[in-house]
Amino acid sequence: MTLAQQIAHPFCLAEALFFAAMLHQFRREVRAVQERAEASTILFQEQGFPLWRAIGPLLRGWALAHQGQAQEGIAQITEGLRAFRATGVEIGRPWRLALLAEAYSIMGQSEAGLTILMEALTLAETTGERWCEPELYRLKGALLLQQSSDHHTEAESCFHHALDIARNQQAKSLELRATTSLSKLWQQQGKRQEAHDLLAPVYNWFSEGFDTADLKNAKALLDELA
């Protein structure tokens, strides 16, 4: 970001804003995502970059959904998805669909979220773009539980699948998320020791980033399980 601003190259700044916003989204830093997304929207409108112009609404919508404005967030994410499709760009679509599914989850619309995730998982399978597959399965499990407590067996299977894929990818942050979701389910089922023993070694692997939402959530759950 600093270098892009120093050289005042619009396209480089556009790329820097996008990847900064994406990084903040991975870290679940909602306000930072919104700030980067809104800054990118202004730049992209000024410069007329069709591809990058789709980024602003997409990530701003995700941030709004996490700040009590889920309906507006869904509308913005949907707008961003349409703008991406108009450019013909398909790479990254499973991740973008995951943002929409998560917003539907916040809105309490589990059926709509599951429909979106089915599309995302199908795309991941057909295109081979699997880097966000652990999160897709984790979200699917969460939405199944939101839909009905009767779905706990299927949800647990989704969490296990997310965990296995994350381990195979050596994606520790996604492994932590999947493990936290599975451990939370086990806690609700009365399997407190199993939940603790699963989550503790994953959490203890980290040596930094303890200010991030995922690590805070994992630590809070471990404290409950202690």
What is the meaning of each model-derived region?
Residues 1-226:
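Helix-coil-helix junctions within alpha-helical repeat/solenoid scaffolds
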